[in-house]
């Protein structure tokens, strides 16, 4: 496989094709998803229409990238979305091998469900990048599939650490996913409406991850 510029997707369908290649490379069998459907979900009502905090409080939330007032703010949005998506795919790379040694059938089901939902969350972030941020977004969406936790080049250090044992997984879902819940909660108030609207469904799914570690 060439570098990410050789596989830069121009459409969402092309990105999905590259995503399927990522699944093959990391050894995630799509059949493990069962009847779980990878999809893009929004809760527009929960996102609200009005900016809640900061210098732009009280104004209409931004629905397109060009409505964001400054390039530095658009760059910050791309960074936040990219980091969130990067963690989702990284966690699958860290955890995938554990399915072969699950202590119980339920543990295997729980881990497979968590990995399915993490892939959906990664999809969601890639969709935002592909749909709203032009060529820069397409580049970042592709790079989500190029970095790999096993190579130690995911963006956040915690998502490059090996997870050799199920106790690691349980601690991960107890603490790292708990931190992730608060991160999603903060993003749910984003002034960029598509990002805020992405968080409602993600938070609902994240609650199962926390329950697994509790």
Predicted regions and their residues:
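Conserved aromatic-histidine-acidic binding/catalytic patches
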Residues: 72, 76-87, 106, 110-117, ...
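Inter-helical turn/loop segments and adjacent helix faces that build the functional surface
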Residues: 97-109, 133, 182-201, 214
